[in-house]
A protein has these predicted regions:
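P-loop NTPase motor module signature
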Residues: 1-290
Length: 290
């Protein structure tokens, strides 16, 4: 966070959506940039939607600007039309300009091993309370991690909605797991060395539990993980109309987020996902983040 390492020989620069937005506001035609790669475009937010709109405007100023959108769960009906070559400037119902040829779709096949679903809803407790995630739910997530360690082999990756919940579950697990099991947090508030430690492989003879926010949902691969414990919760920006301010609220995760999280367990071999909700809650979840 806050680090920048670029120089005269830089060819590829990795930035956040917010930083690229500020750059577009200062230089709408992105001078010196040949291509922009948007990773995980399915993770929609006000910031990412605005970024995509400004990039499409930039392409009207520079026809040579290449925009590449990547995702394992992208909407292949709307996105190619939106990114298609410019014809007329009037939009169609799919979001792209009328008369435009849709952008080409490149599919990259990846090896994904089967992932078994295990339902582990919290007993007699709602996943969300009036003040966020109840402590009983956090205790249940920690108990589910201990259950997964007893029933499965390999390392465990657990998903919580925010840094506070991550730190709470990490404390519970460190106090209850044997000394040969490392428990590591992973979220955006950590320094680079702590994040690197969470992403490093386990030493021989040791097991590891990584408790993370959605930072590990899709963009990162945590080596050695064969089990995912998903609290099935997420943080969303919401606008408070009465106050005219936006803030983060905790909600149930969407099914597309759940699929992405479960996929972390099937990267290196057959795995399992323990979902801390009931099948009914899962079926009622939105298909994509809203």
């Amino acid at each position: 966070r806050g680090e920048r390492r670029t120089g005269p020989r830089t060819r590829v620069e990795i930035v956040t959506a917010g930083l690229l937005l500020r750059r577009l506001q200062a230089d709408p035609d992105l001078p010196g940039v040949t291509a922009v790669v948007l990773d995980e475009v399915h993770e929609r937010s006000l910031e990412s939607d605005l970024l995509l709109a400004l990039l499409l405007d930039a392409r009207t100023l520079r026809e040579d600007l290449v925009i590449l959108a990547m995702s394992a769960t992208a909407d292949l009906d709307r996105l190619p039309a939106m990114l298609g070559s410019t014809g007329s400037t009037s939009p169609t119902s799919s979001g792209g300009p009328s008369g435009a040829a849709p952008a080409p779709v490149v599919s990259v096949a990846g090896a994904l091993h089967p992932v078994e679903e295990v339902w582990a809803p919290p007993p007699r407790t709602s996943r969300l309370g009036p003040r966020g995630v109840p402590r009983e739910v956090l205790a249940h997530v920690a108990a589910t991690v201990r259950r997964a360690l007893a029933e499965r082999t390999g390392d465990v990756l657990s998903f919580l909605p925010g840094a506070r919940e991550v730190d709470d579950v990490v404390s519970r697990l460190r106090a209850s797991l044997p000394p040969d099991t490392d428990v590591l947090p992973l979220h955006g508030r950590l320094g680079a060395s702590a994040q690197d430690a969470a992403l490093a492989p386990s030493p021989p003879g040791r097991r590891r539990v990584v408790v993370a926010t959605n930072v590990a949902e899709s963009s990162l691969t945590v080596p050695g993980v064969r089990v995912v414990v998903d609290a099935t919760l997420a943080r969303r920006p919401r606008l408070d109309v009465a106050r005219g301010m936006s803030g983060l609220v905790t909600v149930g995760a969407s099914r597309s987020e759940g699929v992405q999280r479960a996929g972390r367990a099937g990267r290196e071999g057959p795995g399992a996902v323990y979902r801390c909700c009931s099948p009914t809650d899962w079926a009622r979840s939105p298909l994509a983040p809203t």
